[in-house]
Amino acid sequence: MEHKTVEQLKRVAEVRDDFQAEALTPTQRLYRWADLLEERPDRRLTTLYGTEYEDEAVRNSMRSDDSPISIAFEDPVLRAAGMKDDTYGEAKRFFEVSDKDLHDVLCYCHYGSGIQAGIAARSVRAIAIRAENPGLMGRVRSAFAL
């Protein structure tokens, strides 16, 4: 995907400057991320190596081209909602998830060097379900989402 500045786009298309991104809750952001991943469920995405072994500063700066996070960052709606880049730390902040949750979606130790987008989508959707339904029932519901 080729990224263009607003000025470049204005040369070839009508661009509205008054667009206001609808405020999305963290759970709505997670569901959108899962939907984006499900658009091409067989797409092979890259994982991040050893997220659990890196100190926080290194882990937060980790990124990879064609990762589940980069799919989210390519989405103009999520960018308009405040997603700043495709790093691990930004995904953690923007989606308001734990290191454990992101580890379960992204880490090499679970999937090797690549993960199918559909599998990542199920993991992201399970996180969203747990966020909506905290406690025991949330864990039960998220187990069936996988």
Which residue stretches match the model-derived regions?
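Catalytic phosphate/metal-binding cores of nucleic-acid and nucleotide-processing enzymes, i.e., regions
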Residues: 2-145
